[in-house]
């Protein structure tokens, strides 16, 4: 059997190529998996579980069909869909996991996370993350009318784009010491995360222990899937479908 990992799809109505690739992946590949893990940023931005647009319903239906078929789906919130909550999970049958957690992957303990918490050198982002994850602020936001939410999110997205243009790639990448600290904290030799859009498999040593960090890829120009079996793992691309 195979366990699949994806992240950073950034699904949005305007990118039908990404959506179609995702749908084909769910129907033709994920349906045959032992489990599917989505490690954040499934959506370009998720405003709230009350989203009932045709696009949101289509994505819900794909997850519902998969879980109904017997494939468990696990989800970790990313920096763009941290408002995805229990209502979405109930409607789709997926399971929401903690921001950082460990799983048993064919006998090996593995730590999985979205990855933004590893980018501790980006102080401005970490402060922003701390603010938007305040329970009281999320409580207020969930009760704001939908049209106002959309305006707030549009302004936030514009600010994020402007901010990224003035940051170095090094600042937006993970901090290696933080990676080692988290892996040591959870006593694991393998970490899987997304967020940085830099798909790769990194082998390194810490305290004389061989460690591995797998970075999932984004779906901007092609799909990206991590396939894990009892015999090993492979980070693979999935081409977009062209008419």
Curated annotation (Swiss-Prot):
UniProt: Mn(2+) 2 binding residues: 41, 79, 114, 195
Residues where Mn(2+) 1 binds: 8, 10, 41, 197
Positions bound to substrate: 79-80, 122, 164, 167, 195
Cofactor binding summary note: Binds 2 Mn(2+) ions per subunit in a binuclear metal center.
Pfam families assigned: Metallophos
Biological process annotations from GO: lipid A biosynthetic process
Reactions listed under catalytic activity: UDP-2-N,3-O-bis[(3R)-3-hydroxytetradecanoyl]-alpha-D-glucosamine + H2O = 2-N,3-O-bis[(3R)-3-hydroxytetradecanoyl]-alpha-D-glucosaminyl 1-phosphate + UMP + 2 H(+)
Topological category with respect to the lipid bilayer: Peripheral membrane protein
Entries under InterPro entries matching the protein: Calcineurin-like_PHP_ApaH, LpxH-like, Metallo-depent_PP-like, UDP-diacylglucosamine_Hdrlase
A single Gene Ontology CC term: extrinsic component of plasma membrane
Cofactor or coenzyme needed: Mn(2+)
Principal location: membrane
Broadest EC class assigned to this enzyme: hydrolase
Entry keyword set: Cell inner membrane, Cell membrane, Hydrolase, Lipid A biosynthesis, Lipid biosynthesis, Lipid metabolism, Manganese, Membrane, Metal-binding
Pathway participation: Glycolipid biosynthesis; lipid IV(A) biosynthesis; lipid IV(A) from (3R)-3-hydroxytetradecanoyl-[acyl-carrier-protein] and UDP-N-acetyl-alpha-D-glucosamine: step 4/6
Documented EC number(s): 3.6.1.54
Subcellular location: Cell inner membrane
Entry annotated with the keyword Membrane: yes
Record GO terms (molecular function): manganese ion binding; UDP-2,3-diacylglucosamine hydrolase activity
Top-level lineage group: Bacteria
Function, in words: Hydrolyzes the pyrophosphate bond of UDP-2,3-diacylglucosamine to yield 2,3-diacylglucosamine 1-phosphate (lipid X) and UMP by catalyzing the attack of water at the alpha-P atom. Involved in the biosynthesis of lipid A, a phosphorylated glycolipid that anchors the lipopolysaccharide to the outer membrane of the cell.
NCBIfam families, A to Z: lipid_A_lpxH, PRK05340.1
Family: Belongs to the LpxH family.
Protein name: UDP-2,3-diacylglucosamine hydrolase
Species of origin: Vibrio vulnificus (strain YJ016)
């Amino acid at each position: 059997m195979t366990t699949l990992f994806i992240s950073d799809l950034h699904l949005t109505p305007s990118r039908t190529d990404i959506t179609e690739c995702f749908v084909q992946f769910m129907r033709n590949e994920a349906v045959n998996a032992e489990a599917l893990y989505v490690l954040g940023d499934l959506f370009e931005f998720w405003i709230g579980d009350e989203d009932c647009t045709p696009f949101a319903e289509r994505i819900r239906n794909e997850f519902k069909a998969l879980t109904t078929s017997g494939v468990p789906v696990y989800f970790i919130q990313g920096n763009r869909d941290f408002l995805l909550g229990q209502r979405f999970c109930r409607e789709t049958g997926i399971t929401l996991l903690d921001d950082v957690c460990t799983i048993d992957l064919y006998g090996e303990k593995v730590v999985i996370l979205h990855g933004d918490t590893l980018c501790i050198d980006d102080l401005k982002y970490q402060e922003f993350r701390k603010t938007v994850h305040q329970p009281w602020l999320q409580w207020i936001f969930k009760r704001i009318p939908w049209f106002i939410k959309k305006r707030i999110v549009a302004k936030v997205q514009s600010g994020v784009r402007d901010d990224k243009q003035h940051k170095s790639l090094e600042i937006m990448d993970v901090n290696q010491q933080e990676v080692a600290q988290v892996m040591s904290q959870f006593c694991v030799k393998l970490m899987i995360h997304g967020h940085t859009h830099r798909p790769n498999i990194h082998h390194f040593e810490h305290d004389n222990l061989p460690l591995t960090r797998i970075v999932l890829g984004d779906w901007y120009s092609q799909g990206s899937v991590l396939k894990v079996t009892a015999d090993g793992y492979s980070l693979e691309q999935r081409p977009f479908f062209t008419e």
